[in-house]
Amino acid sequence: MTPTAVRRWDVVVRRLPLYASGAFVVLTVFLSVLATLTYRGHGPGRTGAVLNGPAWLDAWFQGDSGWYYRIADSGYFYTPGHQSPVAFFPAYPLAVRALGLVLGGDWSTAAGWVTLISALGAVALFADWARTRLPPRTAVVAVALLLLYPYSFFLYGTGYSDALFLLTTLGSFALLERRHFVLAGLVGILATGGRPTGVAVLIALVVRALEMLAEERAARAAPRVPVSVTSGRGGVREADERPERRAGPVPLRELCGAVRLVRWRQLAVLVSAAGLLGWMVYLGVRFGDPLAFVTVQGAPGWDQGSGPYTWFKALFVATVLKGMWPTLTLLAPQALACLAGVLLVPTAWRRFGWGYAAFAVVSISIPIIGTKDFMGAGRYMLVAFPLIGAAAVVLTGDRRPRWLAPAALGLAAVGLCIATVAYVSGVEVS
């Protein structure tokens, strides 16, 4: 890469959160037009009592959006053995209700705006995270992957919780990296109270806090090497000494050894568990089952009960053996996304360390183990953001052809458009 090209990439990366936010707005407009045209031509009918907002937002109100509408409007109920809203964690519907009250009880419009605002913040935070850990071109590709991932349509106005969960997850990590341990724990409450995979945030915050302690201790013990720095308006070069940087994550032994360095301020990240614990206490007190969000998954129609039938994907295997191609068209891409996620974990660990690898592992393990046929796994992979960064690393490696990343992004963009049309047409895409 020429020096001029390097400088151009550097300029882009310095403003990457701003550019990423602008790209998100442009894609929101484009996909909303596509969704509106699709909805008017092929979308299922909806009653005005539910959808009384602008058409470009109403088009995104499909699938489980109705459950969040019901929770925001009427609260929770639980009928054992039947599908019930306790399957859905409270952070997102509470946010929808809060905004909906401002909008005069228009819950569907509120749901769309909560998603859009959350997604805009999440994209900016991800861009900031990527630019501090990846080379300039790789960081740009990582942001593009987040925006164009086929299941990223859930970020562009749907009544789903993915955008808010991604925002609170990235926010808690951003605060942790700045040593705001209490604030990281408080924002983490929204994440663990946002969806079942919120437990991944709790685990990862703890691991990352330990990792930061281990890194600080290693930096103090590392030999110092001379470097030249530029200071002053005249560009005077001065000698300085900095710790020698060690490539890769800290050894596991040092990570475990950092436990004895923990102080009360680091323990504050454990506050993030309050979201999940509070939800379980509510379910236990009101419905007599603190794990109702797990129990209800086995209700007829969802049939996501735990056990070997679910763990070993018996239904998915049967679907493959019977050659049920229309169903496989929906399930196979999500199974491939899970496979790609598993394969990317080592790269995420080498590049981003133990904490982010722990988040990725737990995030993808829950849908892989907990779904009977991989349905829903595609959007669960969306929030495993370290894997998106790892995918960008793979696509832009030194041994990769320059056309590989643009080709992959182009293919992803086509998939995003197809998934959007299918979703708005009432197809259960993920």
Task: Say what each PLM segment does.
Residues D106-T109, F126-L148, L167, W354, ...:
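Transmembrane-helix signature of polytopic, membrane-embedded enzymes
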Residues L270-A273, G397-E428:
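Signature aromatic-anchored transmembrane alpha helix within multi-pass, membrane-resident enzymes
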Residues M1-V50, L261-V271, L404, A408:
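Start-transfer (signal-anchor) and selected internal transmembrane alpha helices
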Residues A59-F77, G81-G104, G307-F316:
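Short hydrophobic/aromatic helix or loop-helix immediately within or flanking a transmembrane segment
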Residues T28-P44, W60, L202-L343, G355-A360:
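Membrane-lumen/periplasm interface segments of specific transmembrane helices
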Residues V114-S118, L134-R137, V141-A174, L183, ...:
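Multi-pass, polyprenyl lipid-linked donor-dependent membrane glycosyltransferases
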Residues Q83-P90, L94, V102-G121, L155, ...:
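Loop-to-helix entry region of an early transmembrane alpha helix in multi-pass inner-membrane enzymes
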Residues A98-L101, W113-R133, A340-P346:
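Transmembrane-helix motifs of polytopic, lipid-linked glycan transferases
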